[in-house]
Amino acid sequence: QKVGEDVLVINPPFKTMEEVEMDKSFDLPYTRLPHPKYRKRGPIPAFEMIKFSVNMHRGCFGGCSFCTISAHQGKFIASRSEKSIMKEVEQITKAPDFKGYISDLGGPSANMYRMKGKDEEICARCVSPSCIHPVICNNLDTSHKPLTDIYRKVDKHPAIKKAFVGSGVRYDLLVDDFNKNNSDGNHDEYMEQLITRHVSGRLKVAPEHTSDATLRIMRKPSFKYFHAFKKKYDEISAKFGLKQPLIPYFISSHPGCEEEDMANLAAETKDLGFHLEQVQDFTPTPMTVAEVI
């Protein structure tokens, strides 16, 4: 790309890591402790939050216009093997201050583990920034079964009292009207496992807005799918007698969002019974589409 008298060279992204490469990188002998220079400064809040968490995969195919995860980690999912994940769980249980609780079995989006193209040659030719917007690609395998199986294996570990999912769940992947890949019931199986065993009081999801016009610019699905997800979530919670509120995240001031849209957001979320605590005001982030709109 010419810039005046100079030429800017942009290297292509590195290829997606294979499972064996992921396992090697995570199997290195990490101390799982902060850098020694912080020893005299007392507890580090950010470290305390994630010290007993397990990162199961890298990458995100959501392609949200305000997000840089795909630029940093890639659009394609690089997943660790079950053996590597369980090895890390075992390491965590040996920590002297471990009390039996894993804070997160997750990734950039909690529920994209092992998801990839059925025919990866089609993916190699694809230039779309998202695999799930405006619709889910027919070539994308979105089965939640491998993830459900790992949750259950971790649950059965004798030293684990509870393993929570602290990463954000991509809820639209679990709505049958949006994601048709539920012929074997993998959505329902995953949702029951998640809601009954892995929610630490409340579940975080990110519809981001209620205005479909704004959501299209964000590359997010229509808010009607959040209604469908909430209905399913409430039904499963009621079935098992659980009171675990949904916590939806929203963005204000996003490009394409008008004051009227924010007024409607306030009214619609109030009608749904939400008392919003967390609304992020849009911050232009380098390397995002939303930054340059």
Model-derived features: where do they sit?
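Glycine- and acidic
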Residues: 6-8, 39, 49-55, 65-76, ...
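Conserved, mostly hydrophobic/aromatic
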Residues: 25, 60, 64, 85, ...
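Cysteine-centered iron-sulfur cluster-binding motifs in ferredoxin-type domains/subunits
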Residues: 53-65, 76-84, 88, 92, ...
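N-terminal pre-triad scaffold of radical SAM enzymes
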Residues: 39-68, 86, 101, 283
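C-terminal accessory regions of radical SAM enzymes
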Residues: 1-14, 18, 260, 272-276, ...
